[in-house]
Amino acid sequence: MKFSKLSLTLALILTQVLFVLCGKINEDFMKHGLESQALHDEIRKPIDSENPDTERLLDCLLDNRVCSSDKDCCGMTPSCTMGLCVPSVGGLVGGILG
């Protein structure tokens, strides 16, 4: 197969552009890791905001299994029952849990 000088030059230029682009992405990754600035700001929001997201809710509940009042249960739907943060569940399970 014969390649013209122009096609080889274009292939070389495109390869260099690809390497530069990958280098910039890698440099940004080395500085910030997997977190973008927007994600970092979201993580820093207070837990007791009006509409807490699911991840923060789960993190709070898993960290605060033992409680002395409802406030220890992140101030959300779960309540402190017998020293444990228990979600408000209806039906048979809710009756058993209190």
Curated annotation (Swiss-Prot):
Tissue: Expressed by the venom gland.
Cellular component aspect of the GO annotation: extracellular region
Entry's localization field: Secreted
Keyword presence, Signal: yes
Keyword Membrane: no
Signal peptide range: 1-22
Cystine bridges: C60-C74, C67-C80, C73-C85
GO molecular function annotation: calcium channel regulator activity; sodium channel inhibitor activity; toxin activity
Residues recorded as bearing Leucine amide in the entry: L97
Predominant place of localization: secreted
A Pfam family annotated for this UniProt entry: Toxin_23
Entry remark concerning the domains of this protein: The presence of a 'disulfide through disulfide knot' structurally defines this protein as a knottin.
Function: Potent inhibitor of insect, but not mammalian, voltage-gated calcium channels (Cav).
The name this protein goes by in its record: Omega-hexatoxin-Hr2b
